[in-house]
From Swiss-Prot:
<feature type="binding site">
    <location>
        <begin position="178"/>
        <end position="179"/>
    </location>
    <ligand>
        <name>ATP</name>
    </ligand>
</feature>
<keyword id="KW-0460">Magnesium</keyword>
<keyword id="KW-0067">ATP-binding</keyword>
<dbReference type="GO" id="GO:0046872">
    <property type="term" value="F:metal ion binding"/>
</dbReference>
<dbReference type="GO" id="GO:0005737">
    <property type="term" value="C:cytoplasm"/>
</dbReference>
<feature type="domain" description="ATP-grasp">
    <location>
        <begin position="104"/>
        <end position="287"/>
    </location>
</feature>
<dbReference type="Pfam" id="PF08443">
    <property type="entry name" value="RimK"/>
</dbReference>
<protein>
    <recommendedName>
        <fullName>Probable alpha-L-glutamate ligase</fullName>
        <ecNumber>6.3.2.-</ecNumber>
    </recommendedName>
</protein>
<feature type="binding site">
    <location>
        <position position="260"/>
    </location>
    <ligand>
        <name>Mn(2+) 2</name>
    </ligand>
</feature>
<dbReference type="InterPro" id="IPR023533">
    <property type="entry name" value="RimK"/>
</dbReference>
<feature type="binding site">
    <location>
        <position position="262"/>
    </location>
    <ligand>
        <name>Mn(2+) 2</name>
    </ligand>
</feature>
<dbReference type="GO" id="GO:0009432">
    <property type="term" value="P:SOS response"/>
</dbReference>
<keyword id="KW-0464">Manganese</keyword>
<feature type="binding site">
    <location>
        <position position="187"/>
    </location>
    <ligand>
        <name>ATP</name>
    </ligand>
</feature>
<dbReference type="InterPro" id="IPR011761">
    <property type="entry name" value="ATP-grasp"/>
</dbReference>
<keyword id="KW-0648">Protein biosynthesis</keyword>
<feature type="binding site">
    <location>
        <position position="248"/>
    </location>
    <ligand>
        <name>Mg(2+) 1</name>
    </ligand>
</feature>
Amino acid sequence: MKIAVLSRNPRLYSTRRLVEAGIQRGHEMVVIDTLRAYMNIASHKPQIHYRGKPLEGFDAVIPRIGASVTFYGCAVLRQFEMMGVYPLNESVAIARSRDKLRSLQLLSRRGIGLPITGFAHSPDDIPDLIQMVNGAPLVIKVLEGTQGIGVVLCETTQAAESVIEAFMGLKQNIMVQEYIKEAGGADIRCFVVGDKVIASMKRQAKPGEFRSNLHRGGVASLIKITPEERITAIRAAKVMGLSVAGVDILRSNHGPLVMEVNSSPGLEGIEVTTGKNVAGMIIEHLEKNGGPNQTRTKGKG
């Protein structure tokens, strides 16, 4: 197969590993800088040009689209889809998962376990919003944040009110979530490929911190997940319409709660921690499922 990898940086661990795994399995791998691709949206013959030449003959495309280039990245990926190229994750599903609120709304509709979450616009509603998520301590998240940036733990109602007012004053869209104390600053990253959890790791926040993201100094370790956690992760990825996803789960007193479904999960943490060839499994999934003009939208909403 001839496989395109949409990535701004060919030197990133995840991009390198996907290219290596593809070459090892006998495929032609081409890394394309997402922002340097441009499109000809012509009737009957949609095209993508790159460095002055049209991109042709691709069987599949692996999107590694960073959060900051979601809009343009999804447009390029959608153009590949219009050309009949099979996407590992499709543009609609990526756009869906990048909107944290939309993701939670879709997951809640399907009855998937979530932390109680509030969303509001008007400052008059702050006291009721705080009560809605069972009061302080609570977590406030900026909707556009990634890698744990823009996430605040408020220990008291007073602190929560001040932080919410500050974010609202900056015209930031925010979510307010119950704090799951029993998770103890740890979450579980389940790596879903197709309809299986192929690898999972526990991420523990460093002392004095509650955000377990590896970018925030969290430490990864091996973990055995429960059947319920496995089913929750697979269902969450399916609701979002993602073939490959990093599903972040908290262990709570009332079962697994989904924090986030990531459409472009990093490979370094999971491969180094588990010793598994995750990149190889992703390429294998493409081989089994990829094919021309198989770009029907998965998921709803």
